């Protein structure tokens, strides 16, 4: 076995080991390997499935799927309404200038928690009106509807006001105090459109600790607000040119991130569309949740059921919590769902000796736009209780880890393409040996993961050709209770900030594949 044969096998083994680091990304990394050894039919050598092609042969001709990812973050979601409005204007203009004026604004919208709610409002509008036109205005209207006046905080803030009037430099600003005490008042009395307290608080029936009561809130105000702006169930179709809705939640018993999908996963014997989510359950038995009619309001509430606020949301006998617990930035769920859908669409036809046009058989590449509500870099170490709590939330909710994974996938694709070009002048025997490697099967690591030939996985190769991040930044008046501040002053400010920051400061360009 020469160096190139050893290298090929080594790459496969590396991808198997990489699954320990990130099982969800394993298949995409394997795809990256196979992207380097893409296939074309060669009329003079019919038995060869591996042929040389340049770096851009496939990606120059592949369709691009444009995806929007919306983080969770409670009231901070108003920022996404402004950012989306600016994005819709920016992308519409760019598409017209490039001669793609008929291109859909987004093909996929994925969200967690409040991001899932925003996503549902947007996709529902497109399904109902058969156009993206007006969707940005609809989302802004939704947030204006959710907002409420600043409550009377005079009594609650008396101690702060006394120190503030003494010019105590440690005292919060007047705006920070308004936000902080408004949320404290909301926690006592609720807000009309989002949550209301369930009284009395739940007693501790385990330790019987009188100080350990659990305050819970009713979801009905939020449910009614969502249903006023989105129609359920939401079932969409690629063939109809409708956007795909991905909603992420957390299975409490299994401790797993779960994605609900508006696109079909197959058809039954009567040709009726099947929509379902399958994931490993107890003792590795697969858990199957079917929702053939589409994503319901329960799926949205499951994505937004904060343990600190709401009871579990039950779906098909399973109990769910907020998706942000495990995946506040659902990039990995987007990548996996994109791959699985196109595996289904392309089918399971054997590839050997049959590929004529690689571009027509492979998964469309992804262009991702991510609207972050949290930032991990602050360059400060707070010492006050509220500041420390806020900093903890920022770091925990940012999810930079998953952004790095998506970047890593593309880096591996590019690296292996370069290795391929180095090997393009090797002899036919070497290529034949590599073909044998590609006939090997992947290792199935769970009951829900299929074992495929590496050759078959060629059909699902794709890249993240663009990743743009729009990130909200805190101002000097920020507080740890920012996710609960639904006052009209704050909501209007967040919408404006989202719009202006998207236009004035061009989104951070993380990945841009030059064709």
Feature-to-residue mapping (PLM):
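Short polar catalytic/cofactor-binding loops
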Residues: 72-75, 253
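C-terminal helical/tail subdomains of lipid-metabolizing enzymes
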Residues: 59, 210, 327, 373-375, ...
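Active-site gating loop/helix substructures
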Residues: 202-228, 235-343, 483
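Patatin-like phospholipase
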Residues: 61-67, 75-212, 226, 261-283, ...
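Eukaryote-biased recognition of electropositive, low-complexity segments
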Residues: 337, 382-383
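A short alpha/beta connector and helix-capping loop motif
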Residues: 330-375
């Amino acid at each position: 076995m020469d160096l190139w044969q050893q290298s090929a096998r080594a790459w496969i083994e590396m991808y198997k080991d990489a699954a320990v680091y990130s099982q969800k990304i394993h298949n995409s990394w394997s795809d990256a390997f196979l992207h380097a050894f893409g296939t074309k039919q060669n009329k003079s050598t019919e038995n060869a499935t591996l042929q040389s092609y340049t770096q851009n042969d496939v990606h120059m001709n592949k369709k691009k799927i444009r995806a929007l990812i919306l983080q969770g973050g409670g009231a901070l979601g108003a920022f996404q309404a402004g950012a989306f409005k600016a994005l819709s204007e920016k992308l519409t203009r760019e598409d017209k200038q490039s001669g793609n004026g008929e291109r859909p604004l987004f093909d996929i919208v994925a969200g967690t928690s409040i991001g899932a709610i925003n996503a549902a409002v947007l996709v529902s509008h497109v399904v109902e009106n058969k156009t993206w036109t007006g969707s940005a205005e609809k989302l802004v209207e939704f947030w204006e509807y959710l907002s409420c006046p600043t409550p009377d905080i005079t009594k609650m803030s008396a101690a702060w006001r006394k120190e503030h009037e003494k010019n105590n430099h440690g005292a919060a600003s007047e705006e920070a105090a308004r936000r902080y005490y408004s949320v404290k008042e909301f926690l006592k009395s609720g807000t009309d459109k989002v949550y209301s307290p369930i009284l009395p608080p739940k007693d501790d029936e385990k330790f019987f600790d009188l100080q350990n009561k659990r305050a819970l809130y009713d979801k009905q105000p939020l449910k009614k607000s969502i249903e006023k702006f989105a129609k359920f169930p939401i079932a969409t179709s690629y063939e109809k040119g409708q956007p795909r809705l991905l909603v992420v939640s957390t299975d409490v018993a299994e401790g797993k991130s779960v994605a609900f999908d508006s696109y079909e996963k197959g058809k039954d014997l009567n040709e009726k569309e099947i929509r379902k989510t399958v994931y490993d359950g107890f003792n590795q038995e697969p858990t199957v949740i079917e929702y053939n009619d589409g994503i319901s309001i329960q799926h949205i509430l499951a994505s937004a059921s904060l343990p600190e606020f709401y009871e579990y949301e039950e779906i098909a006998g399973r109990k769910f919590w907020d998706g942000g617990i495990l995946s506040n930035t659902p990039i990995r769920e987007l990548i996996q769902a994109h791959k699985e859908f196109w595996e289904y669409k392309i089918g399971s036809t054997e590839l050997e000796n049959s590929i004529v046009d690689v571009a027509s058989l492979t998964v469309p590449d992804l262009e991702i736009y991510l609207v972050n509500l949290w930032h991990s870099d602050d360059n400060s170490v707070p010492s006050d209780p509220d500041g420390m709590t806020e900093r903890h939330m920022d770091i925990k909710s940012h999810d930079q880890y998953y952004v790095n994974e998506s970047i890593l996938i593309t880096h591996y694709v590019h690296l292996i393409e370069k290795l391929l070009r180095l090997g393009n002048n090797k002899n036919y025997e070497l290529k034949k040996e590599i073909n044998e490697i590609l006939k090997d099967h992947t290792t199935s690591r769970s009951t829900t993961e299929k074992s495929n030939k590496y050759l078959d996985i060629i059909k699902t190769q794709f890249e993240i050709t663009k990743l743009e991040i729009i990130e909200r930044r805190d101002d000097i008046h920020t507080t740890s209770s920012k996710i609960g501040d639904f006052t009209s002053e704050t909501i209007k400010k967040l919408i404006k900030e989202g719009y202006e920051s998207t236009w004035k400061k061009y989104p951070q360009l993380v990945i841009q594949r030059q064709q």
